[in-house]
């Protein structure tokens, strides 16, 4: 469960810059996120129109003034491809380098131009699209986000579901959500019910009436409806998330617990188990206890 959370000005401290270019004749997109913690590091995603699958980049140490070689996580245990950028400067207007086959050493020239910088400083305004890396056989996802200069939190106003087969948008969900401090992780994916396609959750965006501060809450859940072939919100899951803790098993079972279910004397915690039938229905299955 992700509960209510006030986003502070430091929450947007990881700037992400998107770039576009071509690899041969194929359009490609690269997003690089800079994390200043632990001496500095880069992460992000790689996207090629030939596959239409945003793939995460391996988090890689980076020191200003040095070149960057960053693996594409096409294989989580043994990446086969990397992006080499030399020279490299974080947030640069243009990048050049190559796509490297790590098995053969073959390199393909790569030239990229900056599209949008989703800035870390409150002084920076921005507007643009960010893909959300996840493996799904049918779809990929993007969010449209904007922030005015001086604002603390960037706002997402649309979530787009795009066909991997055609590259065309099949659904656009409008609303108000917070852009995550790492913008490429704004959508959190998982299997929330027994359906092969990915479901996702996202943090809402609301302004406090008393002080005007932005709150990134509540958590919203979107589940794929096979009958309607669209993603739909699940209000019951959202209420459970407000009341306690949620977790999901690989089989699509939802498990719920709350403070009242904890027995500190016996060091046990009760969990109620549910099956998600549709984006509107839950079925209670049973309860069980776990020791802690």
What is each stretch, according to the model?
Residues 218-226, 275-277:
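Beta-propeller blade signature
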Residues 190-198:
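Residues in Ca2+-coordinating acidic/glycine-rich loops
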Residues 182-188, 239-246:
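Repeated scaffold domains used in trafficking and secretory/extracellular systems
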Residues 168-181, 290-292:
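Surface-exposed loop and turn segments in beta-propeller and other repeat-based domains
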Residues 13-18, 37, 41-49, 63-155, ...:
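Acidic, small-residue rich beta-repeat scaffolds with periodic aromatic anchors
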């Amino acid at each position: 469960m992700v509960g209510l959370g006030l986003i502070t000005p430091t929450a947007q401290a990881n700037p992400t810059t998107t770039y576009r270019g071509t690899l041969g004749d194929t359009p490609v997109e690269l997003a690089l996120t800079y994390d200043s913690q632990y001496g500095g590091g880069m992460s992000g995603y790689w996207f090629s129109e030939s596959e239409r699958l945003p793939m995460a980049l391996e988090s890689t140490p980076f020191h200003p003034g040095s070149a960057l070689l960053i693996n594409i996580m096409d294989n989580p245990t043994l990446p086969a491809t990397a992006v080499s950028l030399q020279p490299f400067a974080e947030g640069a207007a243009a990048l050049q380098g190559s796509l490297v086959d790590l098995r053969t050493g073959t390199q393909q020239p790569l030239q990229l131009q900056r599209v949008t910088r989703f800035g870390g400083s409150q002084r920076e305004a921005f507007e643009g699209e960010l893909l959300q890396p996840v493996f799904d056989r049918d779809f990929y996802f993007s969010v449209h986000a904007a922030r005015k200069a001086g604002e603390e939190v960037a706002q997402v106003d649309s979530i787009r579901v795009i066909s991997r087969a055609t590259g065309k948008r099949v659904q656009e969900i409008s609303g108000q959500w917070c852009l995550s401090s790492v913008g490429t992780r704004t959508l959190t994916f998982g299997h929330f019910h027994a359906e092969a396609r990915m479901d996702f959750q996202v943090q809402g965006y609301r302004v406090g009436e008393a002080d005007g501060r932005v709150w990134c809450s509540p958590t919203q859940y979107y589940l794929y409806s096979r009958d309607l072939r669209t993603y739909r919100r699940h209000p019951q899951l959202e209420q459970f998330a407000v009341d306690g803790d949620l977790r999901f098993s690989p089989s699509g079972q939802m498990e719920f617990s709350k403070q009242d279910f904890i027995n500190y004397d016996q060091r046990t915690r009760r969990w109620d188990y549910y099956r998600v039938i549709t984006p509107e229905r839950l079925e209670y299955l049973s309860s069980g206890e776990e020791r802690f």
